[in-house]
Amino acid sequence: MNTSEHTYGLAPELFGSWNGPAIGLMDLDAFFASVEQLDHPEWRGKPVIVGGSPEKRGVVSTCSYEARVYGVRSAMSSAQAKRLCPEAIWTPGHFDRYREMSARVMAILADETPFVDRVSIDEAFFDISPGRFCDEHPIQIAQRISQRVSSLGVTCSIGLGRNKTVAKIASERDKPRGLTIVTPGTEHGFLAPLPVRAMSGIGAAAESALARVGIRTLGQLAEASDGLLSPIFGINAELVRRRAAGLEVSEVRAIDAPDDVKSVSNERTFAHDLTDPSDVKAAIQLLSESVGARLRRRGLAGRTVTLKLKYSFGEGRTIQRKLAHATDDENVFGAVACDLLASIWTEGMHIRLAGVGVSDFGPDPHGIQTDLFCAVDERGAMASDKRDLAVTLDALRERFGNDAVAFGRSTRFGGDLVDPAKFLTQHAPEDV
């Protein structure tokens, strides 16, 4: 049975024995806008939009549920949002405040279980499996987490199931203030009727490719043959199928587990070999965007840039360059990676895999970001517009996925990529 209740008046049978892992996903509801309404009581019950100015071609980072009634959505242009909801209250956002509130929420999770995996500023997985840390029923713990978060003045939605895929999808079924429980053994019935895009990692390109072979629901995806899935997902076809069937095996590490990261990298295997210089450079920049976002999320910046290529005939080449200063800006290290290309590749050679990495971490001369749309360097001067934009895009992509915003260079060959790196097992993003 799966259920979802705002008041948590849950059916007694749900509290029977829970067999196997219990993985939760806590997602803060309209987080940035909720914090703004908390800090400005006069804004409560009114449409609030957090984002760039409509007069300066800004974008919406997030908005309150009152604004969503008018059709306003994250990643929408601010100009369009203003047309849809002219009475909305606009704010550029205050990222330091959001981080402060996020830390308080994450502390609640850490108090309930040592097994917490923070996904983004407003989202985290947690493991409350019976017997792993305590013997209390997982549903009771999830209820208490929701209530404790609400006591801070913001709300969350929680999905609870036996793995991360189920928990993530469940958390999105009944927002805001939802608690959706997928009890052990009911995963197939919960997932099967849902569209394939409900599963994280399936973007527009994969959705279109699946539709062309008649696969539109997770139930159909779970039963599809290798012959249908391998051309779309390559070596990851079986992993995708298991996730769609609710059979994924998930791990949530302890908060204090070793995290001595020496490098951050991302690799992709291409569905079709790349031979055109423009396509190769676009692929390198796409990989760099992912690495840059993960560097900023961890508060890291590196001096050494690594470019890795693997050719269709099996041979691979790797080359590095050291920078004068550490950076987390993909526009900087991505350009360096593209510049390194000529040293290990000749036009016409078939590239099967490409990877970009950053290591040798040190202080970033740009300093830390103090406002969602306004970054300040160590001398108090305004940082570059590109860095400001990168931080904003990070927030959008963290919350709504990599498809939320993309540059033309990233989409020119997107349909030829094995679907997003979340599906890659042999060649996944790495923090090592």
Task: List each model region and its residues.
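C-terminal hydrophobic structural anchor segments
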Residues: 327-399
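Gly/Gly-Pro- and Ser/Thr-rich, intrinsically disordered tail segments characteristic of DNA damage-repair
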Residues: 1-242, 255, 293, 377-432
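DNA-contacting surface of Y-family translesion DNA polymerases
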Residues: 10-17, 198, 206-351, 363, ...
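Short, charged/polar surface micro-motifs in flexible loops or helix N-caps
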Residues: 31, 54-57, 312-316, 361-364
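Short, well-ordered secondary-structure micro-motifs
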Residues: 61, 168-170, 252, 318-319, ...
